[in-house]
């Protein structure tokens, strides 16, 4: 519709609205109950048309004052207003639902490996652990991959190409998703996975289910350089564009200390400050305890523990230790978020524990009860038994007097806090249920308070779901890999 037509419609609409408004006001009574002078003059001069005017007035009053009439006029004006706007084309999210790339991806070149290290280096896929046969005790640790988006060649006819380690399956499924987004209609093809016939070299991770040889279902060799790059982005620990006919990828062992616990936790011996003023070990915390936390402004507040993201008192893990100049010591897993104060910018950020550096500032509770910056003097690592990850309503917790996040793996505190909003809502709804509250009161009288926490052993189901989804929706730079 051109501008002249729109202007004409606007003029008609304005005239109609003004006419209806004038007629509506002309028949409204004055505050003293008298009719307006215009109506009196009209009645004196046109007595014969009184009946017609009254009927018309009632009709106008009905149109002007009923909700149906008001809605009709509003819709008419909105329609005319919409016609005055020109349509615009917006950019869509691209093919599929995959995460957007932050940078351009460059294909690998023939014979290139990422990282440029030996495959058995600790920073790559790590050392060999020994071949696995069907009758080996470790064979039960391998898994089958039935992903329908992956084409398995299976030359042997035994299904061996579907057998692999858990980490290898995770990365392979992620790569299959990326391949479908990169080339619609093309699937990832696995030509070799676990090898029980020892058809490779003496030292091969194929024998452990930690390596795969891949290609594309259309056998288009021009895609293989980009396929190798996608494998790197998917998280394979070592990728080699070894041949023009295929790509070789391998991963760390599932029992590798560097990946044995990818979530964020504290040690059970670490303590939190209760609202009563008493200190309590994290291994003894219970849902409903109110512990010292930190609000969005960096001020100390007490917040309720609503669940445990993870809790396993027997698992042995590697931890990072932060020592401050005030004597505080925080022991936490490398992927956990720690609050770091930047005095130059006067801002508070959250970074992964293994990326905190000496001379950084962390917030520590002082003798007055306030959270004050203290310098990190020394960093170390320690191996300890047990992991505990309480989640408070604030999303933060002060452990061993050091302010830390309740979240890990994801670099954004606000995004992680938003992701746990359903659990906070569920906790609130449960607190409003009298029956549940009465049941909890009855249980508190008959059982120790920490029985609630002891019922959980392992990763919380909702946290586990978020950890699995993150690889598909978040950029790699946002994750602790």
UniProtKB/Swiss-Prot annotation:
It is an enzyme of class 3 (hydrolase). This is Protein hedgehog. The record marks 336 as: Essential for auto-cleavage. Its EC number is 3.1.-.-. One of its GO terms (biological process) is cell-cell signaling. It is found in: Nucleus; Cytoplasm. Interacts with shf. The record marks 310 as: Involved in cholesterol transfer. The record marks 264-265 as: Cleavage. The keyword Calcium applies. A lipid is attached at residue 264 (Cholesterol glycine ester). Ca(2+) 2 binds at residues 156, 192, 195, 197. Belongs to the hedgehog family.
